Amino acid sequence: MPKGRQKVPHLDAHLGLPICLWLELAIFFLVPQVMGLSEAGGLDILGTGGLSWAVHLDSLEGERKEESLTQQADAVAQAAGLVNAGRIGELQGHYLFVQPTGHRQAMEVEAMRQQAEAVLARHEAVRWHSEQTLLKRAKRSIHFNDPKYPQQWHLNNRRSPGRDINVTGVWERNVTGRGVTVVVVDDGVEHTVQDIAPNYSPEGSYDLNSNDPDPMPHPDEENGNHHGTRCAGEIAAVPNNSFCAVGVAYGSRIAGIRVLDGPLTDSMEAVAFNKHYQINDIYSCSWGPDDDGKTVDGPHQLGKAALQHGVMAGRQGFGSIFVVASGNGGQHNDNCNYDGYANSIYTVTIGAVDEEGRMPFYAEECASMLAVTFSGGDKMLRSIVTTDWDLQKGTGCTEGHTGTSAAAPLAAGMIALMLQVRPCLTWRDVQHIIVFTAIQYEDHHADWLTNEAGFSHSHQHGFGLLNAWRLVNAAKIWTSVPYLASYVSPMLKENKAVPRSPHSLEVLWNVSRTDLEMSGLKTLEHVAVTVSITHPRRGSLELKLFCPSGMMSLIGAPRSMDSDPNGFNAWTFSTVRCWGERARGVYRLVIRDVGDEPLQMGILQQWQLTLYGSMWSPVDIKDRQSLLESAMSGKYLHDGFTLPCPPGLKIPEEDGYTITPNTLKTLVLVGCFSVFWTIYYMLEVCLSQRNKASTHGCRKGCCPWAPRRQNSKDAGTALESMPLCSSKDLDGVDSEHGDCTTASSFLAPELDCPPHQPPDLLQGKSGQIC
């Protein structure tokens, strides 16, 4: 045996191990108890089991020192047969009395409880006491019985945590879109599906194709009129009904405007954008011009006016929120800046990424894209699970919704969550919050650039991925941005040739401080460029805009399928890549021809620059960024914290009317009848005047002119002094009448009394027949 180590007498190996274990257990229980009796730290251990009472000693705050209160607490606890475990947190005069340790029978424990209650109830130093019981608390989490909810990876991605819209934490705080109405402008909404029916808003719905209030989709040969119903389910599908799936804003109301299932006119589009705009808060539009890589189109005159009117007067003056899809023409090399809905300053343009955060094959790029959210990708990746129609081949649920058509409704639902916590967000507030909170992420296809204001943007993903948690927390403390300021340059006549690559045409325009003084514009939001260019092949043109900071925007990307020979006629491109930068400085428009064919050179005829922004300074933007980041912990996201909202404007609902073919036919018939009646009336008046010019008389008979008429003329007698017409009554007695009425006076009362004929024409005539 090694020196220094001796065997303890009578301690065999088979007894040593149990004894050591008993010693360790004794130390484990006794040491915390001793520590707990001397300080409040023991509260955590002794207060979790056995009998315990919270006791408030009768002493006013600040009147007695903590030492004396502790001594008094020890004495009261001892009198009750308990042990003072220390002060409860930071509550002065509040102590926890616990049952002394030791195993006791049930009857003994009950006797101790009664004794303690009796002592504490009658002790003069005890103001209040309460026996502590175990409270049932659970970590807040969301559980739905909807069978397809586990497959809704875009809401809660369990396979790849973090690759979702981060909405469950918002739901746990009871933010579900309550009080907000989202309308899906599409091919109809089957509102009788059980996932939609409880949240359906008939007040915000309409069918512009059939001109009735019910937007129910109509079956078609291609079984394709389920698009609007799927979008509606993404937004507001009802949870916990044991059917299909859950919507992003499942507490919101959902409406439908059926407009895409038939011929569409500019007037119908205008009506759709403003239909029930005091009821509907958000307009979700998953449609646009053809995504064929060769179309340049957008809202026409009435549609543009309706968008502008919506953001000015909709939602009691806070502005309707228009969410549009960026388009699915990626496989055709299309670009969403050729889509007038996607590059409008009045819309929120949303693109798509797949489950892995990559840009799908169908997604379009553009400088006007605001943000992206999740959708389906290729066949190996999961698509969006949502409600479906149950007409024709539909089952009421689908796992195959995809495209930017699926991304835009998710964004609309997240905006509904924002409006619940801050109903007075303006349409520009929503855009700003998206810019401030979108998350940049790595994608080898993305060309991320950080602008002068610190915002990162890519043509593929806008300012980044929408995050519901960040959006809602930012909305909770958001105060409105200043009024919209704008600057429009004069129409700049150029008439310069566009050279072929690698050469380029560069034109400049300097925006000075004086130019911006009247509007107060300091920092940018949207920048628009309107160009007129002739070119034999429009798709060969490439247009880039450089802001004063040097931030480049590819506003007009080349398109291989666009062979239109007419060029651009006053087409407006836009960019948001200069958001937050200073407005003053030199703007450069660079145009080049990247085509390979030896065609005639294009001509830049004219262009115009339009700046949109506010009087915010760069410092104001930095301060707002810091404020929002401080709110991302969720500390403001509770009902107790609410910023005051200004009252909205009282704007009456103005029902629009669509010119349907039957209505147009009716108007044509009424118009033709009106023209016929007008011609008849004019002929009647002309004939009446001609008859009066040849005849003059009175209603009751002959009207011989008195001989003194000539004398009156010679004497200069006034017109009103001329004698009245005379006629003979039934007795043959001459009488004068002051009422000269003709048969035509009923049609032309202003011609009742024709002018008197000259006396020389009356010579030789004894009278005229009426």
UniProtKB/Swiss-Prot annotation:
Going by the entry's taxonomy, the superkingdom of the source organism is recorded as Eukaryota
| Protein family membership | Belongs to the peptidase S8 family.
> What is known about what this protein does?
Serine endoprotease that processes various proproteins by cleavage at paired basic amino acids, recognizing the RXXX[KR]R consensus motif. Likely functions in the constitutive secretory pathway.
**What are the GO cellular component annotations?**
endoplasmic reticulum lumen; Golgi membrane
Q: Please name the InterPro entries in this protein's record.
A: Galactose-bd-like_sf, Kexin/furin, P_dom, Peptidase_S8/S53_dom, Peptidase_S8/S53_dom_sf, Peptidase_S8_His-AS, Peptidase_S8_Ser-AS, Peptidase_S8_subtilisin-rel
* DNA damage in keyword set: no
Recount the known activity regulation.
Inhibited by zinc and copper.
Q: Point out the gene that encodes the protein.
A: Pcsk7
Cite the propeptide residues by number.
37-140
Name its co-factor(s). Answer: Ca(2+)
> How is this protein named in the record?
Proprotein convertase subtilisin/kexin type 7
What is the top EC class of this enzyme, as a single word? hydrolase
